[in-house]
Structure formats: structure tokens, C-alpha cells
Design a protein with these regions (language model features):
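C-terminal beta-signal and adjacent terminal beta-strands/loops
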Residues: 66-78, 104-176
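Residues embedded in well-ordered secondary-structure elements
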Residues: 6, 38, 51, 89-91, ...
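Flexible, solvent-exposed coil segments and beta strand-coil junctions
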Residues: 22-30, 76-84, 135-140
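Gram-negative outer-membrane beta-barrel transporters
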Residues: 1-74
Length: 176
């Protein structure tokens, strides 16, 4: 695993880059042999950039996430041999997601503030990438359907308001 974060070289800019490599196999439950589980992506990476624009009291955030294609399997039972076998297998397409958010903090810097609102606009999967998480198979294994999110893109517009305790950093850091 690799991780790099920098908050010091550019004023009000925080960014990090991470990369993970995973090479694993398991002999588990009904697996015919030791195989890579369907939840294990060999390569994952992310890039996150957060910039606070003091003049307009706004935090601008971008994040990009990547995961290489994970394996999928349709493991069937053969009653004639009393063994399991691969009826279908392969790799799902690589996962890509670019997200963006704006956080407006009108109370930041105000003395004796009693209310701390954070107004948020957040868009996940800005480029509308098709994200396939796996496949479902019919009982007889003859048909497979993609497991996809109900919507390719998600837009959130909202406000987080705390009274008495300043939780603006919490709202910003948990938004990405």
C-alpha cells in the first residue's frame, strides 16, 4: 500500500493519493479450488483534493476512485459427481467514480455564533460511468443479469445545522 498526503505546500489545499495492491486466493465454502474472492480487486487507487476558498467561505472537493475488475463466478453443483464446478467466470469491468462537492460555511469566522450551518451540494459519479458490481444468475445458471446501482449518478443538496457546538469540520470531512 502507498499513501501520500499534503496539507502544507499550498495554502488551504489538502490532497492525498492512495494505492493498494491485493493478490489473494481462498479455498472457501463451495469454491471448487482456491480462487480470488469476488470482493477482492487486485488494484485500487484514489485521489482526493479539497480546497477551502476563504473569501467565499466555501470548501470545494473532488475525489476519484478506481478499482480494477473483480472476478465473478457462477459455481454450480453437479449431482452426478457430487462436486461443484464453474458454470461461468470472468471479471467485471473496472470501477471508476469521480465525485464533486461544495460546502458553504456562512458562520465560519463569526464570533459568538450559536448556530453552525453547512450547506452542501454533492454529486457522485459526475461522469456517469457505468458501474457493474457483479452478476446474478438464474437458478439453472442460463441467464445472468448485472448488479448495478439504481442510478448511475447521485446528487445531494442539503444542509447540516448544529446548535451550540461547531461541527462544521465534521460535516465537511464526512461528506466526501
Amino acid at each position: 500500500e502507498l499513501f501520500w498526503r499534503d496539507k502544507k505546500h499550498v495554502k488551504n489545499l489538502d490532497y492525498w493519493i492512495s494505492y493498494s495492491f491485493l493478490d489473494t486466493k481462498r479455498d472457501f465454502l463451495n469454491f471448487p479450488t482456491a480462487i480470488t474472492p469476488n470482493f477482492a480487486a487486485k488494484h485500487t487507487a484514489s485521489l482526493v483534493v479539497k480546497k477551502f476558498v476563504t473569501k467565499i467561505k466555501t470548501n470545494v472537493n473532488f475525489s476519484y476512485n478506481y478499482a480494477s475488475g473483480r472476478p465473478y463466478y457462477n459455481i454450480q453443483y453437479d449431482p452426478n459427481t457430487s462436486k461443484t464446478f464453474f458454470a461461468d467466470q470472468g471479471r467485471i469491468p473496472a470501477y471508476h467514480n469521480m465525485s464533486f462537492s461544495l460546502n458553504y460555511l456562512p458562520a465560519i469566522g463569526k464570533q459568538n455564533a450559536k448556530m453552525f450551518p453547512v450547506y452542501v451540494l454533492s454529486i457522485s459519479n459526475v461522469f456517469n460511468f457505468k458501474q457493474v458490481y457483479g452478476y446474478n444468475y438464474s437458478t439453472n445458471g442460463m441467464r445472468k443479469t448485472e448488479l448495478v446501482p439504481p442510478s448511475r449518478m447521485f446528487i445531494f443538496i442539503g444542509a447540516f445545522i448544529s446548535f451550540g457546538t461547531d461541527r462544521t469540520q465534521e460535516a465537511i470531512n464526512n461528506n466526501l
